[in-house]
């Protein structure tokens, strides 16, 4: 059934919809299956995303028609489809009237993903009007709070030197805590890897107790504050809260040095909101493990990594992993820096829409996945600043002289970039950085030809 006479209004102007402030706008790349017209399929997509189905129903009235989602722009050649969703369509909390991301996803990436006339459809951007934006929690903490704990300026405080304890599984509590201590002697921040939790060989309570002690010892030895991101991911709300409360109690006077990691993609919006609302004084570390199943450019359905990042700021993530923008081992390229800008800036331009965040706190980009001291300068050149949390697992623990030296090499690399000094030149007077060249020779040969002669390495 062709529903374009009801669910398509190609005379609507995007600027007018934005000025009206009553619609969430979504841009998709959509292709109909063979034999289906583009506008007809787009209208069916909008109907399934809002008030319609595949037939007319007798219960529809004038009010219902007034909240139809509307296709307002199509470009069949480029496969671009844009839909305007009235804000009234989205579910609200009964406890406080707040918005919920699960409702946003149910409508914009719901039944429409399985429609028989759609070959593929993937959301590439969305715009949130002020009246709806203000209903989301947004972040309560971000990198500025980490800088405060670390004793740095809360504006432009620079890279937080971090790591992921490796191997990701198989370490018992004491070796895990020992690895934390070793890294903290040179670095700032350690995160649980996403599968680490309460395995039988590494009970959470025992591990956390030893990690808290390792933090105290590292702080005493270095005279510097240290940070730890503890995984509280669980299926059950009460389990997440129980883990969080135990961790804070165990860290005691260092509770404000603790972030909570949640696997936000696999657990969904409910888990992020549980952490955001139960622990508003903790940095909420959004890990996105599994997201590539829908966000990868190889996947033609779902939504992009940019969309995931933008949603995370609405939900209240203090920080989210954004990949390595083509400079590490993860899928991505230099253009992914727009994710960092959308997370971090007061207003930013996405692939299709300009978003003003209206004073909502920033979400911090977290950089991880195959990074080491040699790759950082290129990454910072592309991004334009170093105000990120950078977590190198192999880049720290793969250093020939151990994790302490690995952490120092990462910091020295950032210092060299900020000073505008060539990395090979800087390495001549910084041993840990010089040894990073020997630790990662394949990267060194590719990125810094001639380094062996310059550093006297055979």
Swiss-Prot record:
UniProt GO molecular function? magnesium ion binding; monooxygenase activity; ribulose-bisphosphate carboxylase activity
Which residues are annotated as modified residue N6-carboxylysine in the UniProt record? 191
InterPro entries, per this entry? RuBisCO, RuBisCo_large_chain_AS, RuBisCO_lsu_C, RuBisCO_lsu_C_sf, RuBisCO_lsu_fd_N, RuBisCO_lsu_N_sf, RuBisCO_lsuII
In this UniProt entry, which residues are annotated as the site Transition state stabilizer?
329
| Keyword set, alphabetical order | Calvin cycle, Carbon dioxide fixation, Lyase, Magnesium, Metal-binding, Monooxygenase, Oxidoreductase, Photosynthesis
**PROSITE patterns linked to this entry:** RUBISCO_LARGE
Q: What is its EC number?
A: 4.1.1.39
Q: Where is the active site?
A: 166 (proton acceptor), 287 (proton acceptor)
What is the top-level taxon of the source organism? Bacteria
Q: Where is Mg(2+) bound in this sequence?
A: 191, 193-194
Task: Give the record's family classification.
Answer: Belongs to the RuBisCO large chain family. Type II subfamily.
How does the record describe its quaternary structure? Homodimer.
- Which additional comment does the entry carry? The basic functional RuBisCO is composed of a large chain homodimer in a 'head-to-tail' conformation. In contrast to form I RuBisCO, the form II RuBisCO are composed solely of large subunits.
Q: What does this protein do?
A: RuBisCO catalyzes two reactions: the carboxylation of D-ribulose 1,5-bisphosphate, the primary event in carbon dioxide fixation, as well as the oxidative fragmentation of the pentose substrate. Both reactions occur simultaneously and in competition at the same active site.
Q: What is this protein called?
A: Ribulose bisphosphate carboxylase
State the organism named in the record.
Rhodobacter capsulatus
Q: What is the lineage of its organism?
A: Bacteria, Pseudomonadati, Pseudomonadota, Alphaproteobacteria, Rhodobacterales
